[in-house]
């Protein structure tokens, strides 16, 4: 019985971590070229903007996929000729980085939203655990009273009968 509250907390914590909602606030673009290391953050408000310059090494165009949530088409362009020469296109699903040209691109989560979701779930788990603990305690107390009551009901008549028998034998 002592392990039940701990087990409930564990289950709810796992549930909170796996079901927390993550809001993606932008994109992190990192150069995969060891000779030219570079990493920039692009806000989600720049989605649809053509030719986002990545440290002078190339350009990226990010476009939302119609009807999809957290899914984007990423076009990589060469740095010259006003971004007309495409170096390839990939569809990016948030949480799974893609490589376009020499760039690795991933969605950047909004840590605040994730933390808030986890905190809320953890609080709910704590309240549920407290309620469960209270219920278990109440049930235990009720059981104790019931046992005591039953015990009294059996012991008292038996004592009276024994007393009467002894008095009869004595007479």
Curated annotation (Swiss-Prot):
Post-translational note: The GPI-like-anchor contains a phosphoceramide group, rather than a phosphatidyl group.
UniProtKB keywords: Cell membrane, Glycoprotein, GPI-anchor, Lipoprotein, Membrane, Signal
Phylogenetic placement of the source organism: Eukaryota, Amoebozoa, Evosea, Eumycetozoa, Dictyostelia
Disulfide bonds: none
Compartments, record wording: Cell membrane
Name assigned to this protein: Ponticulin-like protein F
Membrane topology: Lipid-anchor; GPI-anchor
Gene that encodes it: ponF
Main location: membrane
Family recorded in the similarity comment: Belongs to the ponticulin family.
Maturation-removed propeptide residues: 150-171
Residue positions bearing lipid (GPI-like-anchor amidated glycine): 149
Source organism of the structure: Dictyostelium discoideum (Social amoeba)
GO CC terms of this entry: plasma membrane; side of membrane
Signal peptide positions on this chain: 1-20
């Amino acid at each position: 019985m002592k392990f039940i509250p701990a087990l409930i907390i564990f289950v709810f914590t796992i549930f909170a971590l796996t079901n927390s909602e993550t809001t993606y606030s932008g994109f992190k673009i990192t150069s995969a070229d060891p000779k030219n290391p570079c990493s920039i953050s692009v806000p989600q408000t720049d989605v649809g903007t053509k030719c986002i310059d990545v440290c002078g090494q190339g350009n990226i165009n990010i476009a939302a996929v119609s009807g999809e949530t957290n899914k984007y088409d990423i076009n990589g362009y060469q740095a010259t000729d006003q971004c007309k020469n495409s170096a390839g296109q990939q569809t990016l699903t948030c949480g799974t980085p893609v490589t376009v040209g020499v760039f690795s691109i991933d969605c950047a989560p909004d840590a605040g939203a994730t933390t808030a979701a986890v905190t809320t779930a953890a609080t709910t788990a704590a309240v549920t655990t407290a309620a469960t603990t209270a219920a278990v305690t109440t049930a235990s107390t009720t059981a104790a009273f019931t046992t005591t009551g039953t015990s009294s009901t059996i012991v008292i008549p038996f004592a009276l009968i024994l007393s009467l028998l002894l008095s009869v034998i004595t007479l």
